[in-house]
Amino acid sequence: MKEFPKHYNFTENEKKWQNIWQELQIYAYDPNISKAEIYIVDTPPPTVSGQLHIGHIYSYTQTDFIVRFQRMIGKNIFYPIGFDDNGLPTERLVEKQKQIKAYNMERDEFIKICLEVVKNEEAKFRSLFKQIALSVDWSLEYQTISPLSRKISQMSFLDLLHKGEVYRANQPILWDTVDGTALAQADIEDKQKISSMNYITFKTEQGDQLTIATTRPELLPACVAVFYHPDDVRYKHLADKSAITPLFNEKVPILADPLVQQDKGTGLVMCCTFGDQTDITWWKSHNLPLKTIITKKGTINFPHKLDIDGLTIKEARTKIIDILKEQSLLTKQEEIIQTVKCAERSGAPLEILTVTQWFIKTITHKEALLKRTNELNWYPKNMKMRLENWINSLSWDWCISRQRYFGVPFPIWYSKRIGEEGKILYADISQLPVDPLKDLPIGYSKEEVDPDLDVMDTWATSSVSPQLSTYGISEDLAINKVRHDKLFPMDLRPQAHEIIRTWAFYTILKSHLHQNILPWKNIMVSGWCLAEDRSKMSKSKGNVLVPEKLLERYGADVIRYWSANSKLGADTAYSEDVMKNGKRLVNKLWNAAKFVSIHFDKLTSEDKKVSLFDIKEKITNEFDQWMINKLVALVKLATNALQNYEYANAIYLTEKFFWSIFCDNYLEISKTRSYDEANKNPQGQYSSILTLYHIMQTLLKLFAPFMPHITEELYQILYNKNSIHMQGNWINYGDLNYEIDVQGPEGLLEILDIVRKFKAEYNLSIKAPIKLLEVSGIVLSTELVEDLKNVTSAEEIQFKAKDDQIKVNIKLFV
């Protein structure tokens, strides 16, 4: 055994062990091991869009608990790390950090700057993940913008294109006027905004007045119909008639449709192209004309004597309302709270424009995807409902085109050859990755093609995150078929709940379309980290916690302890109290280990090498045997909890045993016997030291997935030169069990508790001597009586007639 240092310095030790683990390749994946022995993780690649916060640490460490456990039970771990460093989120970071705008500079120059920024940001991410002791294999690192990732992503696109699951269409899509790009349904968020319901007077061709309520009067020039509900008796007389739009005097049909809400506004609604999803439905089902008046920049394109051309949407709305008022065509205005669909990133209200884009079919696969959702093992189970609700709510196919620059380009060109103008040309698999602005389709010259200028939605690449690591899209389409077949599908997808509708959904969709299979067997979903007052952390509130400062103050093990004390999937507030408890636990582990270690040299070197099962007969004391039985039960419970991704229960059970059973009771009960200064009971002494030796070792292994540094340091000092985190180093006691009557040891603890309360009540020292303990309700064995005398400082213990419950009469020395 090494010399025991006086104090534990987490700053020095954490850095020391991180370097040693890296040097010794403790967490390296072995590609030569069979698939049955591998545990494969689809690690979430953090988006390079800003600084990592405590919420990232919260989520990533919870995955690491499970991975470390799986490694210790003998699995060959495939645990990669990636960085999602392309797409709109990264572009926004670069524009903010460098004070530039992509559209104001050459594309190549902007991409070059993006690559420089992500390189610097990823170095920070990498450093933080190492500090927090994620046990990833860094040789498996990937970037979603790397040539290999671009190749896999483009391979995915072409595979779906050839299968008929990808199509290009000029149809209504969601448009972000701030970032100047199309978005998918998953990229939007609903925001509550104060708005006004405007009651506007229309007329029929016959001159009868109609009142229509709308929140978007600026779309009057794009009005193509007026609708009422077919059951609404107020408007049935309008069937087959036409209305005249105010200010613009356009004749539009009055039509009936069951989608109209009779109790909203006046029950009459104008259909414009486009204000919302319902407008699209009516436009398609009633074969209405298309009038586009909003530009991609969010301005009005409608030359008219009212002079609204070139105004912003907000300016046009104000101007049209003013004119309606002047002409007495606005009969009423009501302030309302309206749900507005906004871009998740820019926060801008979305418009619906008709633009040619690439889409992946999703609507036709909803039933199949719901079935896939039910085939997956969800941890916790209630998270499954979120994906089911999302799939049921889908009303758009997945638009994957983005009018941006720093992303994976479409491997597509459009022919300019005479006779095939506009023909879609796609790259050959052998050409990938391609940049259509620089590369050419086979058999065509630069003058004969136009490149597709868009890039893919970043989710189109991160949705194949498993395949970015397996180096293949399917059994038939792989860069490395052997690797792909061995690693796909994976065992675990860990992720946060807010990206179930994006990352989880898109990955399941892609895997289903590519290989007709789930991408993983299990999914563990983490919650959010909230501020101490349980509010959401935000820069504007100034309550965002910087991990680096917490690491400096508490160290990684304490932060990991805090993360482990939250149930999987739960939103948890940051807690200084829990952090302090974690610090207290680290100190107690150190002191307890230091205390028990002074006896270990009394054990034979042979007994230290073999398992407890092989020397179980040397643990002879009744209370020691009871402790080992409790320890074996703890190992079974903790192991079962971790196998079911219930890490919080595993650490709770382990910590409870450590504090209550081991430190508060066993260390005190066995202390005199362990020292045995008078050499009265050498067999009992050896039994207690052997028990201490194995309990401490087992506790270190149980705590190891959560607190890797302190457990490694203590394990090295007390037990073994090999790492505690080595593959196959978990505890296995099999069916070890001592046949004893538990009433004796448990009765001892009950008596001890009564004595302790008595001494506390009378302000007596815990070591204050007791003349006599008169006990009724139980009779203890000679061994237990000696242990009870030692721990209570009792000179004599007498057992009286049996009682229904244990009672203790305490007599002190006069």
Curated annotation (Swiss-Prot):
Gene Ontology BP annotations: valyl-tRNA aminoacylation
ATP-binding listed as a keyword: yes
Protein's name according to its UniProt entry: Valine--tRNA ligase
Subunit architecture: Monomer.
Reactions it catalyzes: tRNA(Val) + L-valine + ATP = L-valyl-tRNA(Val) + AMP + diphosphate
Motif 'KMSKS' region: positions: 536-540
Keywords assigned by UniProt, alphabetized: Aminoacyl-tRNA synthetase, ATP-binding, Cytoplasm, Ligase, Nucleotide-binding, Protein biosynthesis
InterPro entries per record: aa-tRNA-synth_I_CS (IPR001412), aa-tRNA-synth_Ia (IPR002300), Anticodon_Ia_Val (IPR033705), M/V/L/I-tRNA-synth_anticd-bd (IPR013155), Rossmann-like_a/b/a_fold (IPR014729), tRNAsynth_Ia_anticodon-bd (IPR009080), Val/Leu/Ile-tRNA-synth_edit (IPR009008), Valine-tRNA_ligase_type_2 (IPR022874)
Record remark: domains: ValRS has two distinct active sites: one for aminoacylation and one for editing. The misactivated threonine is translocated from the active site to the editing site.
Pfam families: Anticodon_1 (PF08264), tRNA-synt_1 (PF00133)
One of the record's GO molecular function terms: valine-tRNA ligase activity
Family: Belongs to the class-I aminoacyl-tRNA synthetase family. ValS type 2 subfamily.
One of the record's GO cellular component terms: cytosol
Protein's cellular compartments: Cytoplasm
